[in-house]
């Protein structure tokens, strides 16, 4: 069963997909979105769901360090609800505290240029979110 992981930001959505056995996560792409224009990438996510025969989606929930839900987490919850209604598959919210920071550190340690980091950070964060989910549920 393939599972999709999403890191939803204000400008991009990082996408990762599990292997068919649900053990490992691989980055797929970064979808550009525009909250001001109400363009959220739902259609592209649905295309990827069909292409990879995804059965479940995990959306990162960026809780505050004190476990409260802030504005960014509220946006992620709404995104997950709308996505679930559009694709007709279960969508799970998963605590993603510090994944973007961890992704940035990983890329810096790998000596990836700032420009390239900007291009791949959300995809790597999606991989980390999905891998955390897979490690916990398998």
UniProtKB/Swiss-Prot annotation:
User: Per the record's keyword annotation, is Hydrolase included, yes or no?
Assistant: yes
Query: GO CC: one term?
Result: cytosol
Primary site of residence: cytoplasm
Protein's name according to its UniProt entry: Putative pre-16S rRNA nuclease
Q: Where in the cell is it found?
A: Cytoplasm
Q: Taxonomic classification, please?
A: Bacteria, Bacillati, Bacillota, Bacilli, Bacillales
Query: Which keywords are on file for this protein?
Result: Cytoplasm, Hydrolase, Nuclease, Ribosome biogenesis
> CDD domains in the record, alphabetically?
YqgF
EC number(s) from the headed UniProt entry:
3.1.-.-
- NCBIfam families annotated for this entry? RNAse_H_YqgF
């Amino acid at each position: 069963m393939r599972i999709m992981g999403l890191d939803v930001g204000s400008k991009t959505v990082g996408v990762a997909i599990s292997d068919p056995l649900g053990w490992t996560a691989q980055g797929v792409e970064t979808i550009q979105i525009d909250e001001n224009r109400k363009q959220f990438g739902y259609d592209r996510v649905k295309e990827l769901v069909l292409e990879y025969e995804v059965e479940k989606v995990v959306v990162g929930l960026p809780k505050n360090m004190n476990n409260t839900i802030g504005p960014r987490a509220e946006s992620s919850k709404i995104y997950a609800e709308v996505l679930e209604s559009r694709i007709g598959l279960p969508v799970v919210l998963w605590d993603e505290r510090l994944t973007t920071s961890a992704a940035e550190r990983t890329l810096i340690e790998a000596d990836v240029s700032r420009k390239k980091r900007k291009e791949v950070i959300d995809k790597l964060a999606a991989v980390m979110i999905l891998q955390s989910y897979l490690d916990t549920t398998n």
